[in-house]
Amino acid sequence: MKTIEVVAGVIRDGEKFFATQRGYGEFKDGWEFPGGKLEPGETPEEALVRELKEELAIDILVKDFICTVEYDYPKFHLTMHCFYCEIQRGTPQLLEHENAKWLSLAELNSVNFLPADVEVVKKIKREF
């Protein structure tokens, strides 16, 4: 089974967390924390800065590491490195996603997160 290595940013603003809804592909309409694939030679932090600039037109500061999720989807294995992030410049623009929401801790279960991201939500809820 093919392994895909990605990064995800849990963007925080006070007690709110930014989630995005996929607008394309096999998992269209599923909710996730934004990010994407690592390119050769990139650190996870560098990939996250690049991906969030490409997807949301924002500059971020990568903060604390949350966890690495290992998840088997039907067609591939996902390794996802997750970090808390803070917006340094810009307002998120949906360049690749169809929707986005700022969610409180209590609202995190109000959207249909993709399975790997559900693991991140559980970790966040344990920390707060």
Enumerate the language-model features and the residues they cover.
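Conserved N-terminal beta-strand and adjoining loop/helix that marks the start
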Residues: 1-17, 37
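Short secondary-structure junctions
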Residues: 55-62
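Hydrophobic packing within well-folded, soluble alpha/beta domains
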Residues: 44-53, 65, 83, 100, ...
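Active-site-adjacent beta-strand/loop module that shapes the phosphate/pyrophosphate-binding cleft
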Residues: 59, 69-91, 101
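Conserved Nudix-box catalytic region and its N-terminal flanking loop in Nudix hydrolases
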Residues: 16-54
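NUDIX/MutT-family hydrolases
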Residues: 84, 93-124
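Conserved hydrophobic "DFG−1" position in protein kinase catalytic cores
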Residues: 11-12, 19, 85-87, 102
